[in-house]
From Swiss-Prot:
InterPro entries: Mechanosensitive_channel_CS, MS_channel, MSC/AndL, MscL_channel. PANTHER family: LARGE-CONDUCTANCE MECHANOSENSITIVE CHANNEL, MECHANOSENSITIVE CHANNEL MSCL. This is Large-conductance mechanosensitive channel. PROSITE patterns: MSCL. The keyword Nucleus does not apply. The chain crosses the membrane at residues 14-34, 69-89. Belongs to the MscL family. Coiled coil: none annotated. It comes from Leuconostoc mesenteroides subsp. mesenteroides (strain ATCC 8293 / DSM 20343 / BCRC 11652 / CCM 1803 / JCM 6124 / NCDO 523 / NBRC 100496 / NCIMB 8023 / NCTC 12954 / NRRL B-1118 / 37Y). It is a multi-pass membrane protein. It is found in: Cell membrane. Keywords: Cell membrane, Ion channel, Ion transport, Membrane, Transmembrane, Transmembrane helix, Transport.
Length: 127
């Protein structure tokens, strides 16, 4: 049972997931710091309000308060995170696309086989 667990843990996708979770947690802290320490003060300067977005609220009654600042803070965090993930995925896709193009160019046999296939298709259509 211990050897099965070791084999499971050492599989590539489990390790990749663990690394992703750890980096994701660190990245979340970084984005929260960016929002709190840089974007929040810029918004506060522009609006003349508080530097902590979480403090922004609309008091309807003593018991009913809409904390729109906390929501705004979460929206900014989400947008920053989503944009960075988009950029990372776009970069990785570009790398994979470049590698596939290099592989296709590096294989002259594939090019010859493609030409033969096209000639055979043309011959079948002519008959």
């Amino acid at each position: 049972m211990l050897s099965e667990f070791k084999a499971f843990i050492m599989r590539g996708n489990v390790l990749d997931l663990a690394v992703g979770v750890i980096i994701g947690g660190a990245f979340t802290g970084l984005v929260k710091s960016l929002t709190t320490n840089l974007i929040g003060p810029i918004i506060a300067f522009a609006t003349g309000g508080t530097t902590d977005l979480d403090q922004l609220q609309l008091v309807i009654t003593k018991t009913l308060t809409f904390k729109y600042g906390a929501f705004l803070n979460d929206v900014i965090n989400f947008l920053i995170t989503a944009f960075v993930v988009f950029l990372i995925v776009k970069f990785i896709n570009r790398l994979f696309k470049a590698n596939k193009q290099e592989e296709a160019k590096a294989n002259p046999e594939l090019e010859i086989l493609t030409e033969i296939r096209d000639l055979l298709d043309a011959e079948k259509k002519a008959q």
